Design a protein with these regions (language model features):
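Short, glycine/acidic-enriched loop or turn micro-motifs at the edges of active sites
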Residues: 70-71, 147
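C-terminal active-site subregion of NodB/CE4 polysaccharide deacetylases
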Residues: 1-65, 71-72, 76, 155-265
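Metal-dependent polysaccharide deacetylase catalytic core of the NodB/CE4 family, i.e.
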Residues: 3, 8-14, 60-62, 82-188, ...
């Protein structure tokens, strides 16, 4: 059986009340729910084997991904993942990586839409935090462009600059890596950018809702958003549980995803 992988995507794990953030306590409850329901969190190497056709996914497989590389991933999510021994992938905006010593661990986190990508360096992971997470064996990192540039653009020179610069930084930071993936910022892409990205990376993630099966288009890998826009904790857990059930079920998940995303080509 060609089982789907449920690739989960999120941005923030902090105590802000907004659609892009999951409170740490709720994040842990969601992970424990998935484990209690028999789901298995796979690491990035295992997922890359599935993408490349070197192995098949087991039933109820999950890959956890974080977009942008925010400091709250380190402060709040990372300790929970260490406690539960759950691996994850983080897609870095590579121009935001700084080698600085963090002075204050208690600053008030801004809401996602209030973050200034040019000025708010402290909201992103620094080099030491990235290294700690990578050396734990739980986290791997890949590219999310250099500057969070929209890949709906038709500016070939700028797209190539974003792809190549980000790839070069990832290679510099992780010289042992031999396979490189990409995540489209905000999930935005078009046929033009998708064609160009193939020259630099082996696969790419979208935000098209759904699971990923071996043999699917590996340059628009579907993911399942687990950001918190629910009315209550119980509603949130129910929604995640339902999404996992639907998208981990062969055939049913594919039909449902295709119907929901019929505007995508």
């Amino acid at each position: 059986m060609n089982y789907p992988v449920c690739v989960l995507t999120m941005h923030h794990c902090n105590n802000n009340e907004n659609d892009f953030a999951i409170r740490p306590e709720l994040f842990k409850k969601a992970l424990l729910m998935a484990l209690d329901e028999g789901y298995k969190f796979i690491n990035y190497a295992q997922f890359k084997d599935i993408v490349a056709g070197r192995s098949k996914a087991s039933k109820k497989s999950i890959l956890l991904t974080f977009d942008d590389g925010y400091f709250d991933n380190y402060k709040f999510a990372y300790p929970i993942l260490k406690e539960l021994n759950i691996p994850a992938v983080c897609f870095l905006i590579t121009d935001k990586i700084r080698d600085f010593k963090r002075q204050d661990y208690d600053f008030s986190f801004k809401k996602h839409k209030e973050i200034d990508y040019d000025k708010d360096a402290e909201y992103f992971l620094n080099l030491d935090e990235i290294r700690q997470m990578q050396e734990s064996g739980l986290f791997e990192f890949d590219s999310h462009t250099a500057s969070h540039f929209s890949c709906r653009s038709d500016d070939e020179a700028k797209l190539r600059e974003e792809f190549s610069s980000s790839l070069a930084k990832i290679k510099e930071l992780f010289p042992e890596k031999t396979e490189f993936g990409f995540c489209f910022p905000k999930g935005h892409f078009n046929e033009f950018s998708q064609r160009i990205v193939k020259e630099y990376y082996g696969f790419a993630f979208s935000v098209i809702d759904g699971g990923f099966c071996m043999g699917d288009d590996k340059f628009k890998i579907r993911r399942i958003d687990i950001s918190n826009n629910a009315k209550s904790e119980s509603d949130y857990i129910f929604r995640i549980k339902k999404k996992l059930f639907v998208y981990s079920t062969p055939f049913i998940g594919k039909i449902y995803s295709d119907f929901r995303n019929r505007s995508f080509k």
